[in-house]
């Protein structure tokens, strides 16, 4: 059993899915692609966690009777704190992805029944003691998960209450609606960071956050301010990070807000945006956790920098980036993560707020 919170820095309750992707002709379809929100968020945290720190990245993979051997080998190469659960009485969760209207929008449907993860999956595992959790769910489910995770921790260790983990909530797109607005405000009190994309943010308020050429910066700031005024976090000191694709992200906490650009400024560098947002959140979580500043905004800004880098690797190809090893250390898609991080920080020094 891992020590309480010492071994696992990050745990996602997003799912692992095997993807089948159908492109517009004449490009042939691809099958048995590693995917799912949980996988991409684990990737985001893993990119900033070379071994032995890689084992601090927690995620759960439910392996059905048809789970491909090569995917087991692939997952093992990441050397993470993954929990592989054998479920031989079912098929692995699989999804179909098809492009609608060119390359802009990817439609999705499940090909096999999904097996959703909840707090029970953490019981009796080191993942329960993670220092941060990524939740991708509805507002009401978010509240349930936070309450149940904290209850489980307290049941096993009475002093766990003093070591509250960071909860990062990614609202599930289908339920970012005005009907869920009040539930959303309730859920904000339970988590530390909320991170929707700008369309999902607008959905809760019934507002359009898309401008003609780029995201509507002022509308996004205004709606985010309303969340902050309502209160994010148990003590009202939480933050919002609104992801805006090619336009970067808005980071905001009480009394402070700041925009950050996306790493890739050219559309040519983006092969497939799928998983970019999830990867961002994995990088964000470990970036906030390992920042070590007493300033909430400084921690969130460090997290957003790391998240932007993680997302940049996720969207350069269909599926996962290629992990390689050299004398100098790990590379992803042939690039050293620290080199890309340094490059990004240099660019941020001259970035003009929109």
Enumerate the language-model features and the residues they cover.
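Short glycine-enriched, charge-decorated loop/helix-capping segments at active-site entrances
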Residues: 26-33, 208-214
């Amino acid at each position: 059993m891992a020590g309480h919170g010492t071994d696992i820095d990050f745990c996602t309750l997003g799912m692992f899915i095997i993807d089948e992707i159908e492109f517009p002709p004449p490009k042939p379809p691809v099958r048995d692609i590693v995917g799912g929100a949980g996988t991409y968020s684990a990737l985001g945290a893993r990119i900033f966690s070379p071994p032995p720190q890689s084992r601090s990245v927690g995620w759960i993979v439910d392996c059905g009777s048809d789970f491909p051997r090569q995917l087991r080998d692939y997952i093992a190469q990441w050397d993470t704190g993954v929990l592989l659960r054998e479920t031989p009485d079912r098929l692995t969760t699989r999804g179909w992805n098809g492009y609608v209207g060119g390359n802009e929008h990817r439609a999705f449907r499940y090909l096999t029944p999904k097996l959703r993860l909840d707090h029970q999956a953490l019981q009796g595992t080191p993942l329960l003691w993670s220092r941060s959790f990524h939740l991708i769910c509805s507002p009401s489910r978010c509240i349930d998960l936070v309450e149940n995770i904290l209850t489980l921790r307290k049941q096993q260790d009475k002093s766990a209450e003093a070591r509250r983990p960071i909860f990062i909530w990614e609202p599930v797109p289908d339920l970012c609606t005005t009907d869920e607005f009040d539930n959303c405000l309730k859920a904000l009190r339970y988590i530390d960071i909320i991170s929707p994309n700008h369309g999902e943010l607008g959905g809760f308020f019934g507002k359009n956050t898309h401008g003609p050429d780029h995201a509507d910066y002022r509308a996004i700031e205004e709606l985010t301010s309303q969340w902050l005024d309502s209160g994010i976090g148990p003590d009202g000191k939480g933050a919002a990070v609104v992801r805006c694709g090619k336009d970067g992200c808005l980071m905001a906490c009480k009394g402070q807000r700041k925009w950050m650009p996306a790493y890739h400024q050219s559309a040519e560098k983006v092969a497939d945006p799928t998983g970019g947002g999830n990867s961002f959140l994995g990088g964000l979580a470990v970036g906030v956790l390992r920042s070590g500043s007493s300033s909430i905004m400084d921690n969130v800004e460090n997290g957003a920098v790391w998240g932007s880098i993680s997302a940049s690797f996720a969207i350069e190809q269909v599926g996962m980036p290629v992990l390689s090893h050299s004398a100098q250390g790990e590379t992803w898609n042939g690039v050293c993560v620290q080199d890309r991080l340094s490059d990004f920080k240099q660019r941020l020094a001259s970035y003009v707020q929109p």
